[in-house]
Amino acid sequence: MTDQLRAKFENIELNAGLGKISAFISMTLSLLCLFGALCFLFPSVLTTPELRPLYSKHSDLFYFSLMAGIIISAGFGAFSAIVRQNRYGFYGLCLALIAAVLGCGVIQAPVLPSVPFYAGFDYFVLTLIILALVFIPLEGFFAKNPKQKILRVGWVTDIKYFMFSHIGIQLFSFLTVMPIQYWITHLPSNPIVPWVQAQPIWLQFIELLIVVDFTTYWLHRAMHEVNFLWRFHAIHHSTEHMDWLASSRLHIVEVLMTRFIATLPIFLLGFHTSAVFAYLVFISFHAIFIHSNVRFRFPYLRWLIATPEFHHWHHSSEKPAIDKNYAAFIPLYDVIFKSVYMPNHLASVYGTVGYKIPNSFVKQFTWPFKKYIQRFKQHFGKPKDPL
């Protein structure tokens, strides 16, 4: 099924006049509306608890947005199906109708028992819409590689990573934050915490950038230099086309390790919640920006903050660029520890060297364990019949 999706929807040119653009808009928007309708039906299990007060306060606005999205997706689907005779436009129209039935209040959802766990469907939908509205036009007007398609090779796999990381946000938080919180409660009080918390929020924000980037620099470097860790990080480097969606291609083991290492100094030093929130929003957007297909170079900032030019070289498969530019935000760490590579021209080829990594989301998940799975089969597998 995954191979069929990639064959049908990857490396496609959205040419005007063939109904492809309207069909793509219809299918994408109707799927998001379907997720949104499910969030209205089952808010206790499909929405993020921190955002529920916002939904309650502006329920009319969100409901209007859902209905508007359904109408727009149905309109594009009908145009593509009827005028251009594109079957995917018909599929988008059908999905829009299903979303309308679920979202209009005709179906009464059963009352679900209160559970401590949730799936962040709302977080996935809202984040995808915002990022797509920002980065698709940005990459269209300022593309580093103008020939790269929006539906380029690998985007189906990357959207699955994006979806998994956003819907499973509670799982990631539980597996990283909870152990740290438990451990810190058993430590003696840190005398630095009151001093940190007494500082203004803007200063704490800057300190967060410096401290967290220092810890993640060494983890990132270890992922390149330690073979066991590299097998997980290689998944991120397997993309051969850089854009905003490529930043999502991260193995779950790498996500857990990075979030744990990044979260540890935040709790140990006791940064204020407002500073942490500002940091998370900023660094999340920045991480997507430095992967995006844009030609911005920022010559006066290139050693102060990581730019797309800087990080694209980290992903380059050119020999001089391999195992360089580890910093996520502060390039000076690479300068100090002699791991920087910034020539005067832009990177042009990407991917891993010497590794054949599968394209499938599921196969990429199991790829780092392939060697150990084979060893297990050799030791415990059924012996072959000598006859």
Feature names for model-found ranges:
Residues 153-353:
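Membrane-embedded catalytic scaffold of the fatty acid hydroxylase/desaturase
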Residues 54-69, 123-133:
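Structural signature of hydrophobic alpha-helical transmembrane segments
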Residues 335, 345-387:
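Cytosolic-facing loops and C-terminal tails of multi-pass membrane proteins
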Residues 8-36, 59-62, 84-87:
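N-terminal membrane topogenic signal
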Residues 40-51, 77-81, 104-114:
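Juxtamembrane "helix-exit" motif on the non-cytosolic side of transmembrane helices
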Residues 108-135, 152-170:
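Alpha-helical transmembrane segments in multi-pass membrane proteins
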